[in-house]
From Swiss-Prot:
This is Orotidine 5'-phosphate decarboxylase. GO terms for biological process: 'de novo' pyrimidine nucleobase biosynthetic process; 'de novo' UMP biosynthetic process. The active site is at 67 (proton donor). Homodimer. It comes from the Bacteria. It comes from Rhodopseudomonas palustris (strain BisA53). HAMAP family: OMPdecase_type1_B.
Length: 235
């Protein structure tokens, strides 16, 4: 069985914002509607990593999404440093050596390591252009099996693949899905997308949502609406 998670905790809002001040303003607007935030490249490189500690101190959860991929020692030490921020989730690319190093670097910390299978902005043509012989579905499945064998805690995958992956990895691995777009939202640069309710029904444990919340006229109302969809899909 998947650990029970409150509906509100299953929404992760991506703070893809230009600086810490903008992120803090968004967090204040969202108030108690959001309990889980993601810090990615844009905010991290603008000095946003210390915000992870502040969010944890405020009782929030933090997903530091830097998709580590380097030589083993560098990945292991990077995981060690990110774990010290108090992050709940961190990401690595789903290459076997990278995943193995990340698990070793975690040590005794409680941080959960998520492996990114194939970016949700990629489709079959993108993989072919990059020289991959496998299509999206086959590559995602291969990486999911490898991740499970190496002790990875969760997978970042398209909601389109969630149901298939759940059958492969079982209930012990968390499925975290970006590419979430509420009905009527623009797809933007995402190609493999799904609504919140459909993603939960497909087996996703956590939904990562950025622009549909942070660029909404009323971000708090947008977040609440997504949580309502999650509740509806789980009752």
């Amino acid at each position: 069985m998947v650990d029970p998670v409150e509906a509100r905790d299953r929404l992760i809002v991506a703070l893809d914002l230009p600086d810490v001040r903008a992120a803090e303003a968004m967090i204040a607007r969202l108030d108690d509607s959001v309990t889980f935030y993601k810090i990615g490249y844009q905010l991290a490189y603008a000095g946003g990593l210390p915000l992870a500690r502040a969010l944890k101190a405020a009782g929030k959860k933090v997903f530091v999404d830097l998709k580590l991929h380097d030589i083993g020692n560098t990945v292991a030490r990077g995981v060690e440093s990110l774990a010290s921020l108090g992050a709940t989730f961190i990401t690595v690319h789903a290459y076997p050596q990278t995943m193995k190093a990340a698990v070793e670097g975690r040590g005794a910390s409680k941080v959960k390591i998520l492996a990114v299978t194939v970016l949700t902005s990629y489709d079959e043509a993108d993989l072919a252009q990059a020289g991959y012989r496998l299509g999206v579905r086959d590559l995602v499945e291969l990486r999911a099996r490898q991740a499970k064998e190496l002790g990875i805690d969760g997978l970042v995958c398209s909601p389109e693949e969630a149901a298939h992956l759940r059958g492969i990895v079982g209930d012990g691995i968390k499925l975290v899905t970006p590419g979430i777009r509420p009905a009527g939202s623009a797809a933007g640069d995402q190609k493999r997308i799904m609504t919140p309710a459909r993603a939960i029904a497909a087996g996703a444990d956590y939904l990562v949502v950025g622009r549909p919340v942070t660029e909404a006229a009323d971000p708090k109302a947008a977040a609440d609406a997504i949580v309502d969809e999650i509740v509806g899909a789980t009752t």
